[in-house]
């Protein structure tokens, strides 16, 4: 239990926050935009915290890059963009969506946010409203895009009431907005020493492989479905 509690205590740490836009895995933003359009690739973007950013690892070892490997192995015409940002709370994520992300090309958006709100004991209703606003912004600005919501779990030492409110916010948001839902990003990784860095806190390369595996189980059918729909379109 305490290992799980500790695993939440560092989500807000990692690379310094940057105002630079994320670069697609595998090259510069300009190069990847060019190659994507040339090859008729579609974009799946990962909006997230240090868990998506890949704290303590090279970007190619973070789970979004592992997802790209799975996409390539499956021969699917999709490109991953890792838009993770360490230390980001849901309000800042919303601001990024409104000012930058909504202007980027993407067909599927994976949303992972809220962990850093939880670390500071931020009001759950406020966090939930921010996530809802992210969903609303994407639906209004990119109505054809598919949103996948990633759930998070609160540290038990925050108290039963807070834990219940926080943990319940994500499945409820997914249900109310009819979104594809991944219940817990760190399933099978949180608190497992062999899957975390030497500090016993952050997922290591093996941990990110596990994360990529269970994210892929949800993401793959979405990409195949949307790829088929695109191919069938006149």
Locate each region found by the language model.
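Conserved Rossmann-like nucleotide-binding pocket used by diverse enzymes
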Residues: 9, 79-81, 148
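Alpha-helical cap/lid subdomain in secreted, periplasmic
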Residues: 94-234
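Serine-esterase "nucleophile elbow" of acetyl-processing enzymes
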Residues: 20-86, 96-105
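Active-site micro-motifs of SAM-dependent methyltransferase domains
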Residues: 52-53, 73, 87, 117, ...
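Bacterial signal peptide processing site
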Residues: 13-17
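Short, flexible loop segments at the rims of nucleotide/cofactor-binding pockets, characterized by
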Residues: 85-89, 158-160
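Sec-dependent bacterial lipoprotein signal peptides
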Residues: 1-11
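Short polybasic/polar patches that bind polyanions
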Residues: 9, 72, 175
């Amino acid at each position: 239990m305490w290992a799980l509690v500790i695993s939440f205590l560092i989500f807000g740490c990692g690379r310094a926050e940057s105002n630079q836009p994320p670069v697609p895995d595998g090259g510069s933003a300009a190069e990847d935009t060019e190659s994507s359009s040339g090859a008729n690739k579609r974009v799946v973007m990962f909006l997230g915290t240090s868990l998506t950013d890949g704290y303590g690892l090279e970007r190619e070892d973070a789970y979004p890059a592992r997802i790209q490997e799975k996409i390539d192995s499956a021969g699917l015409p999709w490109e991953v963009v890792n838009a993770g940002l360490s230390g980001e709370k849901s309000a800042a994520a919303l601001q990024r969506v409104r000012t930058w992300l909504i202007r980027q090309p993407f067909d599927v958006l994976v949303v992972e946010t809220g962990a850093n709100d939880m670390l500071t004991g931020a009001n759950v209703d406020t966090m939930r409203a921010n996530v809802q606003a992210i969903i609303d912004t994407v639906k209004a600005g990119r109505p054809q895009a598919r949103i996948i919501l990633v759930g998070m779990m609160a540290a038990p030492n925050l108290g039963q009431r807070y834990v219940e409110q926080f943990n319940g916010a994500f499945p409820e948001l997914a249900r109310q907005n009819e979104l594809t839902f991944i219940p817990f990003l760190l399933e099978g990784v949180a608190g497992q020493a062999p899957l975390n860095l030497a500090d016993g806190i952050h997922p290591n390369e093996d941990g990110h492989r596990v994360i990529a595996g269970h994210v892929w189980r949800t993401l793959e059918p979405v990409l195949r479905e949307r790829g088929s729909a695109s191919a069938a379109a006149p």
